[in-house]
Amino acid sequence: MNAIQESFTDKLFANYEANVKYQAIENAASHNGIFAALERRQSHVDNTPVFSLDLTKDKVTNQKASGRCWMFAALNTFRHKLISQYKLENFELSQAHTFFWDKYEKSNWFLEQVIATADQELTSRKVKFLLQTPQQDGGQWDMVVSLFEKYGVVPKSVYPESVSSSSSRELNAILNKLLRQDAQILRDLLASGADHATVQDKKEDLLQEIFNFLAMSLGLPPRKFDFAYRDKDDNYQSEKGITPQEFYKKYVNLPLEDYVSVINAPTADKPYGKSYTVEMLGNVVGSRAVRYINVPMERLKELAIAQMQAGETVWFGSDVGQLSNRKAGILATDVYDFESSMDIQLTQDKAGRLDYSESLMTHAMVLTGVDLDENGKAKKVKVTLGNADAENQEILSGLKK
């Protein structure tokens, strides 16, 4: 290994001080911040909030201090349909309801994984992975569909937010503490030679404790409820004693079994046209597996545009923290000028960014509009970002590589 020599550092000083541009950027960046100093004026011109296809102007929902973006995005795709079809105003589906059942199901998923790996040492890679984070807020499209199909959905007015659904840190800390303790109980029971029935009986006792904790923290979910509303024409509508599953089938009524997650992962280990999954990722035991179909980016764009042209908003995920100006509402790879300002060359392609851990999907959102050119190609898309950090605004996404 070669250490940095003082003579080399002297050379770097000399090169920097000889460049007047660097000193100007130093003044701007040190006083205003790096991104503010490098922001491209043209990015605002290229991303004006006008779209040739704009599906919704509904008020944006806010996930607050929780990791429920995937739930919010999925429920917002239904919400647009319901508001349009039933002439509703300021209507939301309950994100807290889906959150409750996700925590319940993830707890069972974790305990079943603990049972399945009980013959492995605590130091094994899989067991360490399980115990590191027994459960957390995040999820995928297939996971939220599994929850909808099993537990249905309810209006937010029926099961509103709680402190622990809007800010989930305390709940997650306590639930993970319980689950790690439960993992030890089940592993010790299996190590003592207990049979399958005894282990499952104990697991059910542990799930009762977890259910009680969730109900006391979030509120007990409704088994049946009354649904009453006034539409935009001020007509009164009501329905008595409907279950969450009945509400889902009657009012949402989408063939979600026909929807799949399509991704663009141009890495050598993931050929296009094939289906992929992630081991030990899920929530509802026995439900649909998390699955992705890998396609070229142009095909992904075509599918998203076609779905919006058919009148449906699109659930999607991206690396939302990369190269964005949230205050301006712009998410685009050319929003900041690193090259001509700082002489920094950001040339790593998407495959390289994925392979070298520079990028991954971090946030789920909804595509709600698109601006097409004369050839039907997307110039920019409209994105609904249900996130408190972005001041609950809609952002724009430039469709560049």
Describe the role of every protein-language-model region.
Residues 67:
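Catalytic cores of glycan-processing enzymes that make or break glycosidic bonds
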